[in-house]
C-alpha cells in the first residue's frame, strides 16, 4: 500500500495503528509529496515507527511471537528428521 501511495506521489504525514477485533489497521493522513522510506518504514510506516505507536508495537510483538513459533516448529521437525537420518546411518554400525 505505501509503495503504491509513494508511486502515486503521496507521502504520509501522520499515521496511527488501530486494533479492532484482534485485527490491526494503519490509519494515515497523506499529502502530495515525495519521501524516501527504508524497507522497514515501507512495511510498517515511517511515522508510526518514529512516533513509537503502541498499537504497532503490539502488532510487531504479536507477529514476532507467531513467526518464532512457526520457525521453532520448522526447525524442530528439520532437526528431528536429520537426527532420524543419522540414527539410520548409525544402524549400519550397530550403534543405537
Residue ranges and their predicted role:
Residues 1-96:
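Class I S-adenosyl-L-methionine
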Amino acid at each position: 500500500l505505501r509503495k503504491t501511495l509513494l508511486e502515486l506521489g503521496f507521502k504520509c504525514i501522520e499515521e496511527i495503528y488501530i486494533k479492532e477485533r484482534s485485527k490491526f489497521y494503519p490509519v494515515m493522513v497523506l499529502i502530495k509529496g515525495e519521501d524516501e522510506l527504508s524497507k522497514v518504514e515501507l512495511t510498517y510506516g515511517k511515522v508510526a515507527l518514529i512516533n513509537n505507536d503502541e498499537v504497532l508495537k503490539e502488532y510487531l510483538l504479536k507477529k514476532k511471537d507467531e513467526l518464532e513459533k512457526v520457525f521453532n516448529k520448522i526447525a524442530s521437525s528439520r532437526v528431528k528428521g536429520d537426527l532420524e537420518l543419522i540414527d539410520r546411518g548409525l544402524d549400519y554400525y550397530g550403534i543405537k
